[in-house]
Amino acid sequence: MKQVYLDNNATTRLDPMVLEAMMPFLTDFYGNPSSIHDFGIPAQAALERAHQQAAALLGAEYPSEIIFTSWPRATPRHAAIALLPERREIITSVVEHPATLAACEHLERQGYRIHRIAVDSEGALDMAQFRAALSPRVALVSVMWANNETGVLFPIGEMAELAHEQGALFHCDAVQVVGKIPIAVGQTRIDMLSCSAHKFHGPKGVGCLYLRRGTRFRPLLRGGHQEYGRRAGTENICGIVGMGAACELANIHLPGMTHIGQLRNRLEHRLLASVPSVMVMGGGQPRVPGTVNLAFEFIEGEAILLLLNQAGIAASSGSACTSGSLEPSHVMRAMNIPYTAAHGTIRFSLSRYTREKEIDYVVATLPPIIDRLRALSPYWQNGKPRPADAVFTPVYG
């Protein structure tokens, strides 16, 4: 059976060249990078090179601004701990990754006031609400650069400038943009930026935090000098080497993301032409090249995914961290997508390994699946939606 992987926002395949770079550090170069003998020296050299590779991809001015970690989305807690006690407010958005939302809820229980900025039906951030929430009481702004479900990009540069006008730190969750669009963090007012290697063909379990030189910071993990004293614990050299290699390869392949955008558009346009009652989530906004979220009205996204999987196609109904729930995702609810559409959202996310013939296979396979499921739907009759008064339409609670 043909296999097509279009769930790259959840994770990506490991690049063979990344694996090749990692292997010696699983077998031969097993020394501790903190050791000064001949076993530790190659590990330390590899660690320094990985800092340089990550800094180059992110556009950081100094390799020492990179902190390798297994938990890049811990940044809101890092930043809040570092700030002055009189600043007790944090700004985020309603469509952040569940890990960020959970961190903000934890801080809220500790007495912080959390401003959650709304989005419109296209997934665009309410900038008027954002400006109104800013004040000298705000310690931190923590928002994603691109939404993991829709691919919609936020105006990060403008937001960082506005945050600095009020003396707030600015953190950007860049997990879904690194390796997909050019980043020059050193030319922005971003104080902190987090990313994860497995989203751009690196290994799982390793990420990094960009921390602008001079930014206040107090580590959550203490007890060691590693990562310039900012992340205690013996370094995961194998994983870090893999992330460094993935960063270098991502830099090389960045120009090819234009082609990925063209493939995304091919998938999007052909499905819109062949399937009725389908909407593109955030289609009117700037998006990362490889993400498209389609809402197939009047059917369940989980059913679509199961039938796609039987045809060898891997996609997602939203964030991998929330899949398994039958409720529409918090992102769809925040965008106020109609219930009958929000339940039928499918996210296709491409990578540099995606080929045109795979896109064409999806375009040929999906419409019959939609027809089959709609034939069973109480909301669909004779090839079109049933009258609104003929069925019960649930609403969000």
Swiss-Prot record:
Enzyme type, top EC level: transferase
UniProt-recorded Gene Ontology molecular function terms: cysteine desulfurase activity; iron-sulfur cluster binding; metal ion binding; pyridoxal phosphate binding
Pfam families: Aminotran_5
Reaction(s) the record says it catalyses: (sulfur carrier)-H + L-cysteine = (sulfur carrier)-SH + L-alanine
Transmembrane region(s): none
Modification sites for N6-(pyridoxal phosphate)lysine: K199
EC nos: 2.8.1.7
Binding site for [2Fe-2S] cluster: C321
Keyword Nucleotidyltransferase: no
GO biological process terms, semicolon-separated: amino acid metabolic process; nitrogen fixation
Domain of life according to the entry: Bacteria
Alphabetical list of Gene3D superfamilies matching this protein: 1.10.260.50, Aspartate Aminotransferase, domain 1 (3.90.1150.10), Type I PLP-dependent aspartate aminotransferase-like (Major domain) (3.40.640.10)
Active site residues according to the UniProt entry: C321
Quaternary state and interactors: Homodimer.
Family per record: Belongs to the class-V pyridoxal-phosphate-dependent aminotransferase family. NifS/IscS subfamily.
Protein name: Cysteine desulfurase
Protein source organism: Klebsiella pneumoniae
